[in-house]
Design a protein with these regions (language model features):
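Residue-level recognition of single "structural anchor" positions
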Residues: 6, 10-297
């Protein structure tokens, strides 16, 4: 799941080149950490025109010196227009946007920058219709930009560690507003007939991992935890049966929600991941209304 599509999550990208080059949130990392813009007015005042945006992106992309984005050669020549480059070795032309999320787009960098700001600072996310209105493009174009930005915000593959909370939730599947003869039977509880189950893990004071899964059976839940949580970490969950064997692999503490227990002595709880779900669902119901399983992940 591409979480920042729905939440204001600060992504601290520490690698500025190589694999991070096509990630537009390299830029967001820089403005959050270095310039720390507090408002959209401050942001647009700083990035006031296309020339400023281009110079800023060049500074980031060519941090360690100019190079050809096709072959990596360090001898390149700039055209008189200041926007295009040609490699002295492979003779290929390119712009500062080539092989980035901005590539193949005729939209100005300034438009992309503002879109990224809006998407990353909206707590509950922003719909493509609203984004289109705010940056002056069509809904189709805003959707295209939104999807590119979301894909660039893929989750870190590193494992969580320390104190990790686990929980599962379901997205979609509301049948109450349908006519009785169009309702799918057997959708209550943990049924996945019309709902998408999502497994979530959050490191206390750290990152989140959330993935759409086929079910929340014991084997599936255990596999998700092993994939994303470092062995030796302390795992906190509720009393859902699928977590009952995980104590063989991790120090495991349980909060018995079924008995009205939500916090145990020693700050043992799963409130962090549950708060995450609450924020997610406010964005889902209030902004997106419906989401296919494909776009949920």
């Amino acid at each position: 799941m591409v979480l920042p599509s729905f939440f204001s999550v600060l992504i601290a990208i520490k690698v500025i080149h190589n694999q991070a080059l096509d990630n537009p949130f390299v830029i967001l990392y820089h403005y959050y950490m270095d310039t720390n813009f507090k408002t959209l007015i401050q942001f647009t005042t700083y990035f006031k025109d296309e020339q400023t945006c281009q110079a800023y992106f060049e500074q980031i992309r060519f941090k360690d010196g100019e190079y050809c984005v096709h072959c990596g050669h360090t001898k390149i020549n700039r055209f008189k227009d200041g926007k295009r480059f040609r490699c002295a070795k492979c003779k290929k032309d390119f712009t500062i946007k080539t092989k980035t999320v901005f590539g193949e787009s005729k939209l100005p960098l300034q438009t992309w920058f503002v879109a990224m700001y809006l998407l990353s600072t909206s707590n509950k996310g922003i719909s493509s219709i609203q984004l289109a209105k705010q940056i002056g493009v069509t809904q189709k174009t805003a959707w295209f930009m939104d999807m590119r930005i979301r894909k660039s915000m893929k989750q870190n593959k590193g494992q969580l560690f320390g104190i990790v909370e686990a929980d599962e939730t379901y997205v979609g599947g509301k049948e109450k507003n349908k006519h009785w003869d169009k309702r799918t039977k057997g959708t209550r509880g943990r049924s996945t007939e019309t709902k998408a189950p999502v497994m979530g893990l959050i490191q206390r004071g750290g990152e989140v991992r959330a993935n759409v899964v086929d079910d929340v059976k014991m084997r599936t839940v255990e596999q998700q935890i092993v994939n994303h949580v470092k062995i030796g970490s302390n795992l906190y969950t509720d009393d859902f049966l699928s977590y009952s064997r995980i104590g063989k692999l991790y120090p495991h503490e349980v909060v018995k929600h079924g008995m009205g227990q939500y916090v145990r002595a020693g700050n043992i709880h799963s409130n962090s991941i549950e708060s995450f779900w609450a924020l997610f669902k406010r964005g889902y119901h209030g902004v997106y209304h419906h989401m296919s399983k494909k776009h949920l992940q």
